[in-house]
């Protein structure tokens, strides 16, 4: 996932790898917080959500607010989609 996020942000250096990995982890935790199953991180919409979150956190091209809105919208849509809802651990 780190490589995909770096490519999406047009970053080739390894200097920000720790920060970006932290953003990736935070995005996945945020998705889980609203009940989204992130166990299959090869799902295109999960990857897209993580990329949007990272663009928001990095204020990519000074458009962080736009990426925040896009991430929030996708997160809300995924939380309502049956295919992405995590199964209860009852």
For every predicted segment, state its role.
Residues 1-90:
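Divalent metal-cofactor coordination and adjacent catalytic microenvironments
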């Amino acid at each position: 996932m780190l490589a995909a996020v770096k490519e999406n942000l047009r970053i080739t250096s390894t200097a920000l790898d720790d920060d970006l990995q932290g953003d990736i982890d935070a995005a996945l935790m945020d998705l889980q917080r609203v009940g989204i199953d992130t166990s299959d991180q090869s799902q295109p919409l999960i990857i897209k959500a993580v990329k949007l979150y990272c663009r928001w956190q990095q204020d990519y091209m000074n458009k962080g607010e736009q990426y925040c809105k896009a991430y929030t919208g996708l997160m809300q849509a995924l939380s309502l989609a049956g295919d992405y809802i995590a199964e209860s651990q009852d």
